[in-house]
């Protein structure tokens, strides 16, 4: 069956594959996907038209790729979907430049930059009385000279995930679940040694 829309995905990990699979299972549609690497779960998938673009996270290149897809599927509504924080951010910040047949179902760039930063997100939760785990914001300058008002296990995750993954260190974890104080300190040292410079969010498990 012919449909009047075309999914356009950005990314290359399991999130992209999962979204593409959902579209394929529901509508029989083959999603177009732009990813940075010729590898990963989405690469060479039979349900994805995967296109390698090393500069995929550059704003100008991102807009060019959207424009190409809009022209290729000129008779359809192109659904621009970022599968990952950096691509969600790009879609939100650039959607005003997209061709008329493109839709990016995101909030404004200003709001996404608040929501995507975990430090700002939890501050917003506090402002509106939304419950969340006990949280301390850690700065690199604190070194090992700090304490937490709760015991292990400790959760540690980057406040700015876009800058975090831009470090390009494959040994970094999305979230650290530390079973001891020593493991927490080692994890923090490892993160900053990898080149990340922003804050870390420490939380009660």
Regions found by a protein language model. Give the residues of each.
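A conserved helix-loop-beta module that forms one wall/lid of the active-site cleft
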Residues: 100-175
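Short, well-ordered beta-to-alpha junction loops that form the rim of enzyme active sites
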Residues: 83-85, 159, 204-205
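Generic secondary-structure signature for well-ordered alpha-helical cores
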Residues: 96, 130, 193-197
């Amino acid at each position: 069956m012919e449909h009047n829309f075309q999914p356009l995905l950005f990314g290359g990990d399991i999130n992209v594959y999962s979204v593409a699979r959902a579209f394929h299972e529901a509508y029989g549609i083959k999603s177009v996907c732009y990813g940075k690497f010729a590898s990963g779960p989405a690469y060479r998938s039979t349900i994805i038209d995967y296109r390698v673009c090393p500069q995929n996270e550059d704003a100008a290149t991102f807009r060019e790729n959207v424009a190409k897809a809009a022209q290729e599927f000129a008779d359809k509504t192109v659904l621009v979907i970022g599968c990952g924080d950096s691509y969600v951010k790009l879609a939100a910040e650039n959607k005003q430049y997209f061709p008329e047949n493109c839709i990016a179902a995101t909030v404004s760039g200003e709001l996404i930059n608040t929501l995507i930063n975990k430090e700002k997100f939890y501050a917003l939760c506090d402002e509106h009385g939304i419950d969340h785990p006990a949280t301390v914001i850690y700065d690199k300058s604190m070194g090992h000279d700090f304490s937490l008002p709760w015991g292990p296990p400790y959760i540690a995750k980057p406040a700015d995930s876009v800058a975090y993954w831009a470090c390009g260190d494959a040994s970094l974890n999305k979230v650290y679940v530390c079973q001891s104080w020593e493991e927490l300190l080692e994890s923090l040292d490892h993160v900053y040694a990898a080149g990340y410079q922003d804050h870390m969010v420490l939380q009660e498990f």
